[in-house]
Every structure is written in C-alpha cells, then in structure tokens.
Regions:
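A conserved beta-turn-beta hairpin within the catalytic core of GNAT-like acetyltransferases
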Residues: 71-83, 93
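Conserved acetyl-CoA-binding loop-helix of GNAT-fold acetyltransferases
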Residues: 88, 94-110
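Conserved active-site alpha-helix within GNAT-family acetyltransferase domains
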Residues: 123-148
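C-terminal "cap" of GNAT-fold acetyltransferases
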Residues: 148-173
C-alpha cells in the first residue's frame, strides 16, 4: 500500500519505501545531512519490515514501526509490532492525525497476525520524544513493564493469548561500569547527527570526560544497558537521560556555569 486516506479529516498519508525515499521528505529531518543519515538508517531497515507513513501535507506528522524482533530496543516482545516513533507536532496537532496513523498500524498488525503493538512512553519532563501515556491509555494501551529510570513499555494486545512484552534485564536496570560521561546513540533519530559532535566538542573544550558510542548494529542495540537506544547518556555508571542534549544543556548538566 503506497497511500491511505481518511475521509473524516481529508488527510492522505504516504508510505515511505526504498523506491521513493530519495525523493520524499521524512518529517523529522527535512533537509541537510541529518536527513541523509536518517534515510540511510531507514533504507537498511525496510528489508526488516519497517513501515514509515507520513502526512501528505508537509509537517511533523508520521509513524514509524517495525516487527519487534527487529526493533533497536532491548525488549522481549515476540509476535509484536514495535512503534519506533509516533510524532504529531505543531499545527498538525488536534486534527485526529495520530488516531489515523495508529489505526493504520493496528490494521497492519492484525493483517500480519501479530499478537499486539508495543511502544515506549514516559511522563512529564521525562517524555521528550516518547509517547504520552495518557494518550496511549485512552487508545487501549496498558503498562507492560517499567524501567528503573521511569520509562515504561506499553502494549495493546490484539489476541486473547498475547503474552505481555517486557524489558530485558539490561534495560530494566540501566547501568554501566564506566566513570565519566558515556553516550550511546544511533542514527534512528536525525537530531543525534547534529548534536552529538557539538556536545563532544564542548566536553573536550572544558576537559569533561565523555565517551561517545555510535550503535550501528541491531544486536548491540537490543542488548544496550538502557531502555532507549537512540540516545542514552550515562554519568559515572548511572543512566542520566534519553533527552538529546544541546552543547549548552550538556555543559549545564556537567556543572559548567555561564
């Protein structure tokens, strides 16, 4: 299916595939090298079952999902679809577009005979780019598991026998055995391409110990010691945040004034 449309709001949605990705924008990265890095990551995932739909109208309105066995997160969710990102922002909010996109994911999951759908969420300031648990609860999702850092794995079962998905132990209790700052990231989120080098430069300029680790392998991502793999920042072994830091925010986090 290349497109689907909803009569209620007259919006059409385009499916991004290996055939059209070079000529289509992908919402979260509309230009420059950020888009190139994200698109390269997507191209490698399409063969693994990744689906990406965006609104025909230009803006931040899209869903990205993949069979859970191929998801770049440390979860056990056999038979599930995992939503990488469901993002509706700015002027796109308030028109029912999220319901359209989630509805298409549910339809697809049923067509594939999947046990259900799962997605990460968090409350309040911890949420950032993760989904709103209140919205997910309204749509029938319930909490399957919770990491020590407060990030939850929510799920929508589609069969009576669906097993509850869960975090792997490494994600349930995120910690590492290294001192200083350690940052794990992937190219799944285009903003890492821009901000990680700038944070690294700022850390070096201020003598702050920072090790950056780009994850480029699914198996490594699926066993990372954090529930979020697109961006996971640790300090002295403890998980700090999955929120992508600007250079200024990172320096403030490190205690640099001014």
């Amino acid at each position: 299916m290349g497109k689907f449309a909803k009569r209620r709001n007259h919006m059409q949605y385009i499916r991004i595939t290996s055939e059209n990705i070079d000529s289509e924008h992908i919402c979260c990265a509309m230009s420059g090298k950020q888009s190139v890095a994200k698109k390269a990551w997507l191209k490698e995932r399409f063969a693994e079952g990744l689906v990406f739909y965006r609104s025909e109208e230009r803006g931040k309105c899209f869903i990205e999902y993949i069979p859970a066995e191929n998801a770049w997160v440390p979860i056990d969710a056999p038979g599930y679809l995992y939503i990488n990102c469901l993002w509706i922002a700015g002027s796109m909010k308030g028109h029912g577009y999220s319901s359209d996109l989630l509805g298409e994911c549910i339809r697809d999951a049923k067509a594939q005979g999947r046990q259900g759908i799962c997605i990460l969420s968090a409350k309040g300031r911890k949420r950032e780019f993760l989904s709103d648990p209140k919205y997910l609860s309204y749509k029938g999702f319930t909490v399957a598991d919770t990491s020590d850092c407060g990030i939850t794995l929510m799920y929508l079962p589609l069969t009576p026998s669906a097993e509850r998905p869960k975090f792997k132990k490494c994600a349930k209790h995120p910690q590492i055995g290294e001192d200083g700052f350690v940052l794990y990231y992937t190219d799944q989120c285009p903003f890492t391409f821009y901000w990680v080098p700038r944070v690294a430069e700022a850390a070096a300029a201020h003598g702050i110990p920072l090790k950056t680790v780009r994850i480029a392998d699914k198996e490594i991502a699926q066993n990372l010691p954090a529930p979020v793999t697109t961006y996971a920042l640790f300090r002295d072994g403890k998980f700090v945040t999955h929120t992508i830091q600007s250079d200024k925010k990172f320096l403030a986090l490190a205690g640099v004034k001014g």
